[in-house]
């Protein structure tokens, strides 16, 4: 089994990593792919020189920062992982990456946006939950949150 865990450096994303590490610690046999999705390169071009090498370095550095805490959790737990830094629309990039890496499941954090904000802004976790062909677990964050919401 291969599990994709998209992270953005936020606490809800780290909760998803902790959830997967707990499952692995309880005997689940799976490999782990940590991934982060960066803004499309054209957004960086507005504030940086139009140099492909510079843009690639900036995207990589920002992505590495987003992955750092998740990687530290995996290392502390003695769990090996693969890492991916991609750019584009967050939900679509997660869906594309899950397919490209032949992932069997996606585990991701929920932002906990209210219904109004979610309707106005859209929700990466909601879109992935609806569109992914594989099971998706959305790990809730915060006091009183249920352990996880699963579709699949």
Predicted region positions:
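Structural beta-alpha unit
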Residues: 72-106, 144-152
């Amino acid at each position: 089994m291969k599990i994709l865990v998209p992270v953005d450096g936020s606490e809800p994303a780290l909760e998803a990593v902790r959830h997967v590490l707990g499952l692995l610690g309880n005997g689940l046999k799976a490999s782990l792919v940590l991934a982060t999705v960066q803004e499309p390169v054209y957004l960086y071009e507005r504030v940086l020189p139009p140099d492909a090498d510079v843009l690639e370095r900036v995207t990589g550095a920002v992505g590495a920062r987003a992955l750092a805490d998740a990687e530290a959790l995996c290392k502390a737990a003695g769990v090996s992982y693969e890492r991916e830094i991609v750019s584009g629309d967050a939900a679509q990039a997660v869906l594309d990456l899950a397919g490209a890496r032949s992932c069997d499941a996606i585990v991701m954090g929920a932002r906990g946006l209210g219904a109004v904000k979610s309707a106005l802004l859209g929700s990466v976790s909601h879109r992935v939950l609806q569109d992914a062909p594989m099971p998706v677990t959305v790990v809730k964050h915060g006091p009183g949150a249920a352990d996880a919401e699963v579709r699949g």
